[in-house]
Amino acid sequence: MSSRSPRPPPRRCRRRLPRPSCCCCCCRRSHLNEDTGRFVLLAALIGLYLVAGATVFSALESPGEAEARARWGATLRNFSAAHGVAEPELRAFLRHYEAALAAGVRADALRPRWDFPGAFYFVGTVVSTIGFGMTTPATVGGKAFLIAYGLFGCAGTILFFNLFLERIISLLAFIMRACRERQLRRSGLLPATFRRGSALSEADSLAGWKPSVYHVLLILGLFAVLLACCASAMYTSVEGWDYVDSLYFCFVTFSTIGFGDLVSSQHAAYRNQGLYRLGNFLFILLGVCCIYSLFNVISILIKQVLNWMLRKLSCRCCTRCCPAPGAPLSRRNAITPGSRLRRRLAALGTDPAARDSDAEGRRLSGELISMRDLTASNKVSLALLQKQLSETANGYPRSVCVNTRQNGFSGGVGALGIMNNRLAETSASR
């Protein structure tokens, strides 16, 4: 007898079906560019927000507009009949009045529009992007100069707002960190000899502590409300407006919407005029800076909602395409049953269990290597640079962690870049 092992049966060439992967192509494409998905989702939500706002304002303001048109038509007809003036001639006269109104002419005595104080008020509304519209350049030279002046003025003012945002966030973080240290010291978690910047502070529970965006939002919101209430009290007593109209003017001005239906400091003379104009300037300056900072903090919350919605959509897509977590993954061939494959391996003298364990080890090793490479090259250079600069300026530890997770805030520009790693919700470790 021959000592040779029995020759295995000839292997049939069978066409293998594609093996279903855990993450299908649609899931992979959904993760390619999360920023694009966030942008598209935000654009869709803004569109829905505009539709909802237009519906509400149309329902609230449309009846009043119809009544005002009816009253104005009746008044015009009565005046034309009472004074014997033809209605077309009366309308032509009203068009001349509208042109004079656009040029700054008013029926009541108002302050000059283009003296130095009036021009200073105008350029202030230009560079702050408020743009009330009560004063506009009428000459060609004035319009041409406004284009160049507004280009650099608006850019410089936006930079000023961003620097103000950086300072106010740093100040709030410093105050809240001091309150946190005091609370920990009272509870006995910090020794009485604790000093910021020491080695103990870096190893203790305050290492890398950052204020929550909700606390910053609450503080900025309370300060904005207090500022608007104080300014409204001044406008009510000096301008003679209702308190609700004064609050409305404060929001329209501080948010740089600037409708122009209500404009402060437009009368020819005021009691304590110099003091009032100074107070008006300071209130508008502080209000615009505060509301700008508040808007940027609110944008962080909106971005968190967008990230949550994207995660939900991604998880829903993955649950349709991928097996449930914890389910055993079958490594059988789609054509050859497992029993036949085991018999063939036994005929070849190969242990199926050892073969599976070896393949499993190689697969896990490959996954670990790929995950390690992915973590090392996960766009951490810019985020780490911003984190180091921010933590150096705020006294945070300089420990560098390369295992940063993309939360949608790292590597931002503008106001989001300024608040990067300064709040708990914009930290790269979240």
Swiss-Prot record:
Binding of K(+) 3: at which residues? G131, G258, F259
Residues annotated as region ER retention/retrieval signal? 11-16
Q: Where is this region: Selectivity filter 2?
A: 256-261
**GO terms for CC?**
endoplasmic reticulum membrane; monoatomic ion channel complex; plasma membrane
Mapped to this chain, the residue ranges on the Cytoplasmic side of the membrane are 1-38, 166-212, 303-430
Q: Which reaction does it catalyse?
A: K(+)(in) = K(+)(out)
Q: How does it sit in the membrane?
A: Multi-pass membrane protein
Q: Where does K(+) 2 bind?
A: I130, G131, I257, G258
Q: Where are the transmembrane segments?
A: 39-59, 145-165, 213-233, 282-302
- Sites binding K(+) 1 sit at T129, I130, T256, I257
Keyword Transport among record annotations: yes
Specify whether Transcription regulation is a keyword of the entry: no
What are the subcellular locations of this protein?
Answer: Cell membrane; Endoplasmic reticulum membrane
- Where does the record place intramembrane segments? 114-134, 243-263
Which SUPFAM superfamilies does this entry report, sorted A to Z?
A: Voltage-gated potassium channels
Could you say which tissues express the protein in this record? Highly expressed in most brain regions. Also expressed in other tissues such as lung, kidney, liver, stomach and spleen.
> Biological process GO annotation list?
potassium ion transmembrane transport
Comment field on protein domains: Each subunit contributes two pore-forming domains 1 and 2 which assemble to form a single pore with M2 and M4 transmembrane helices lining the central cavity and M1 and M3 facing the lipid bilayer. The transmembrane helices are bridged by the selectivity filters 1 and 2 that coordinate the permeant ions. Up to four ions can simultaneously occupy the selectivity filter and at least two elementary charges must translocate across the filter to convert it into the open conformation.
**Reported function:** K(+) channel subunit that may homo- and heterodimerize to form functional channels with distinct regulatory and gating properties. Can heterodimerize with KCNK13 subunit to conduct K(+) outward rectifying currents at the plasma membrane. The homodimers are mainly retained in the endoplasmic reticulum compartment and may be targeted to the cell surface upon phosphorylation or other activation signals yet to be elucidated.
- The molecule here is called Potassium channel subfamily K member 12
* Originating species: Rattus norvegicus
